[in-house]
Design a protein with these regions (language model features):
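Basic, Lys/Arg- and aromatic-enriched nucleic-acid-binding interface segment
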Residues: 7-40, 144
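Extended intrinsically disordered, low-complexity coil regions enriched in Ser, Thr, Gly, Ala
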Residues: 24, 41-62, 78, 90-98, ...
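Short basic/aromatic active-site micro-motif
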Residues: 26, 132-154, 172
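Amphipathic alpha-helical scaffolding segments
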Residues: 31-35, 44-56, 165-170, 179-181
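Short, structured motif recognition centered on aromatic/hydrophobic residues
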Residues: 32-33, 60, 79-86, 119, ...
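Active-site-proximal segment of tyrosine recombinases
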Residues: 43-44, 148, 155-167
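Basic, alpha-helical nucleic-acid-contacting "clamp/cap" segments
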Residues: 54, 63-109, 118, 122, ...
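Catalytic-site neighborhood detector that most strongly recognizes the C-terminal catalytic loop/helix
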Residues: 63-68, 165-193
Length: 207
C-alpha cells in the first residue's frame, strides 16, 4: 500500500530558507509550486497568459498535461509573484509561451529532472536533514501532499480539496457543475490566505 509522505513545518521552513538562496527563477517556480498545490508538471508548464481578473479577483488557468484545464482563484500576492516571474522571463528571453523556460532553449519549459538535481545539490551542500537525522530526500510531490494535508486539517470538504488540487473525479465533476468561480473565491479565501502566509513574508525579500 502506498503511503503519502509529508514534510514537517520545520523541515519545510529549513528547506525554503535554502531554496530562497538558489537561482531566483528556480526559487520562484518552487515557491509557486507550494503555494498553488499543483502537480510539478502543471507548475512548470504555466503559460504567460495564465492569469485573468474577474470581479476584482485574480484567477489562474492551469492546463494539466494530457488531462484537464481548470481555473482557481489565487491571492493578489501569488498573482504578483507570477507576474514577477513573467517579467523576469520576458526581460531575459523576450516573449515566450511558458513562464519558466530553459536557459539554453527558451521555447521549452523547465524540466523536473533539472529542478530535482539542483535542489538535491543544495540539500547535500547545506547538509539538510529530516527529523530522523537522515539526509532529506526531496520530491516535489511531497509539497503537494503537504498542501492537501493542510486543507484536510482545516476541515474542508473533499470536493473542495479535489478542486483546489485539480483532481478529476466523478464526485468533483458533480460539484463543479454546481459552483461558480465567484463562490469558489469567497469560500476558499480564508483557506488560501492561511496557506499563503507560510511563505509570502519571505518572498517579499525579492522586491
Amino acid at each position: 500500500r502506498y503511503l503519502f509522505k509529508f514534510y514537517s513545518d520545520e523541515t519545510i521552513k529549513k528547506l525554503n530558507e535554502n531554496i530562497f538562496q538558489m537561482d531566483e527563477q528556480i526559487a520562484r517556480a518552487l515557491i509557486l509550486h507550494q503555494l498553488l498545490g499543483t502537480r510539478i508538471s502543471d507548475t512548470l508548464t504555466l503559460k504567460t497568459d495564465c492569469l485573468s481578473i474577474r470581479e476584482n479577483r485574480y484567477f489562474i488557468r492551469i492546463e494539466q498535461v494530457k488531462s484537464i484545464t481548470f481555473e482557481k482563484a489565487i491571492s493578489d500576492e501569488i498573482a504578483q509573484l507570477i507576474i514577477k516571474s513573467i517579467d523576469y522571463t520576458e526581460e531575459h528571453y523576450g516573449k515566450t509561451k511558458y513562464i519558466f523556460v530553459k536557459k539554453e532553449d527558451p521555447l521549452r519549459p523547465f524540466q523536473y529532472s533539472m529542478l530535482q538535481h539542483r535542489v538535491m545539490q543544495m540539500i547535500r551542500k547545506n547538509d539538510i536533514r529530516d527529523e530522523n537525522g537522515e539526509l532529506l530526500n526531496f520530491g516535489t510531490h511531497t509539497f503537494r501532499h503537504c498542501y492537501g494535508k493542510k486543507l484536510t486539517e482545516m476541515h474542508i470538504d473533499d470536493w473542495m480539496i479535489a478542486r483546489l488540487l485539480g483532481h478529476k473525479t466523478l464526485q468533483s465533476v458533480h460539484h463543479y457543475r454546481k459552483i461558480g468561480n465567484k463562490i469558489m473565491a469567497d469560500e476558499t479565501r480564508a483557506v488560501r490566505e492561511k496557506i499563503d502566509m507560510i511563505l509570502m513574508d519571505v518572498v517579499k525579500e525579492w522586491d
